[in-house]
Amino acid sequence: MDSDTILREARLIKNLKHSHIPVIYDIEEDDISICIIEEYISGKSLRSYINNTDNIKTSEICDIAVKLCDILEYLHNCDNEIIHLDIKPDNIIIDEHNNVKLIDFGSSIHKAGLTQAGMISPGYAAPEQYGGKELTYQTDIYSVGMVLKFMADSNSTVHNKLYPVINKCTRHNQYRRYKNVKALRWELEQTARSDITFSRK
């Protein structure tokens, strides 16, 4: 990551106030170097967490995704209307209290409708991120769907009601995905409840 990208990311995060986004305490720069004082985020990446968790339940998968949706709802509705554009298991941290943290804003942009894109993560990037197409909040929703798929595929006993949610998130046409993360979160909450009910039978 070049110095301009690092500085842009730091300035972007510094203006955000959310408990599950890293805090930038200070940015110091001169002609030679950049010094960024940032909150240390402890925990495991979601990839590591899933790889070291046996038989994760559908309700837990939904809980992680709901917490991620809470962060994205804040980003999408803040003054700068931020689209993250690099949601993947490596950029999601699970701390010791099972809180979900979102890191790496190097590819993020202000406001929906722009076509600028930074680094693309194959397997998690939406189709519109390739080829300079319009980027919207549904671009992030696609990536959430792929993260859901990553978690669901780790356990063959995952409740099959989760897969229709994944399929809607990852539709090729972004305007046929969930309208916003609030709608996606509601669907995840319903799926989690049905899984708990199913487990009790």
Give, region by region, the residue ranges found by the protein language model.
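Catalytic-loop of the protein kinase fold
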Residues: 76-94
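Activation segment signature within eukaryotic-like protein kinase domains
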Residues: 64-65
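Conserved catalytic-loop aspartate of Hanks-type protein kinases
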Residues: 140
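Conserved activation segment of eukaryotic-like protein kinases, specifically the C-terminal portion
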Residues: 115-128
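Conserved short submotifs of the Hanks-type protein kinase catalytic core
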Residues: 31-45
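AlphaC helix of the protein kinase catalytic domain
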Residues: 46-56
